[in-house]
Amino acid sequence: MIGKQATLRDIVLEELVQPIDLHCHEELTEEVEEAVVEEEPEYTPYKIIVVCGGCETQLKLYVLATDFGIRSFQASLLENVKLVCPACREDIRNGRR
């Protein structure tokens, strides 16, 4: 290069520009690999007490659920799901209700 400004004639490319895979030379450390692995959700035991949808008998239900799971189940029970006791189930099965 002669002078204060470079000209196209002064620039010499030694290597051709080629596309490369940006992930080709990367290695993940063990810490990063562990962080990438999804953590198993934490399940908490719950005792649910609800009345039968047929005869108003008290029912107890024991479940293991995540925080999101128990809230979704609660919303279902409050809105559009009714649990029934074994006696009411038989009545429904036999066409009595």
UniProtKB/Swiss-Prot annotation:
GO terms for cellular component: host cell cytoplasm; host cell nucleus. A zinc finger (unnamed) spans 52-88. Highly phosphorylated. Residues 1-40 are annotated as: E7 terminal domain. Keywords: Activator, DNA-binding, Early protein, G1/S host cell cycle checkpoint dysregulation by virus, Host cytoplasm, Host nucleus, Host-virus interaction, Inhibition of host innate immune response by virus, Inhibition of host interferon signaling pathway by virus, Interferon antiviral system evasion, Metal-binding, Modulation of host cell cycle by virus, Oncogene, Transcription, Transcription regulation, Viral immunoevasion, Zinc, Zinc-finger. GO terms for biological process: DNA-templated transcription; symbiont-mediated perturbation of host cell cycle G1/S transition checkpoint; symbiont-mediated suppression of host innate immune response; symbiont-mediated suppression of host type I interferon-mediated signaling pathway. InterPro entries: Papilloma_E7. GO terms for molecular function: DNA binding; DNA-binding transcription factor activity; protein domain specific binding; zinc ion binding. Transmembrane segments: none annotated. Disulfide bonds: none annotated. Its main location: host cell. It is found in: Host cytoplasm; Host nucleus. A motif (LXCXE motif) lies at residues 22-26. The keyword Metal-binding applies. The keyword Disulfide bond does not apply. A motif (Nuclear export signal) lies at residues 70-78. It comes from the Viruses. Homodimer. Homooligomer. Interacts with host RB1; this interaction induces dissociation of RB1-E2F1 complex thereby disrupting RB1 activity. Interacts with host EP300; this interaction represses EP300 transcriptional activity. Interacts with protein E2; this interaction inhibits E7 oncogenic activity. Interacts with host TMEM173/STING; this interaction impairs the ability of TMEM173/STING to sense cytosolic DNA and promote the production of type I interferon (IFN-alpha and IFN-beta). Plays a role in viral genome replication by driving entry of quiescent cells into the cell cycle. Stimulation of progression from G1 to S phase allows the virus to efficiently use the cellular DNA replicating machinery to achieve viral genome replication. E7 protein has both transforming and trans-activating activities. Induces the disassembly of the E2F1 transcription factor from RB1, with subsequent transcriptional activation of E2F1-regulated S-phase genes. Interferes with host histone deacetylation mediated by HDAC1 and HDAC2, leading to transcription activation. The E7 terminal domain is an intrinsically disordered domain, whose flexibility and conformational transitions confer target adaptability to the oncoprotein. It allows adaptation to a variety of protein targets and exposes the PEST degradation sequence that regulates its turnover in the cell. Belongs to the papillomaviridae E7 protein family. This is Protein E7. It comes from Human papillomavirus 23. The lineage of its organism: Viruses, Monodnaviria, Shotokuvirae, Cossaviricota, Papovaviricetes.
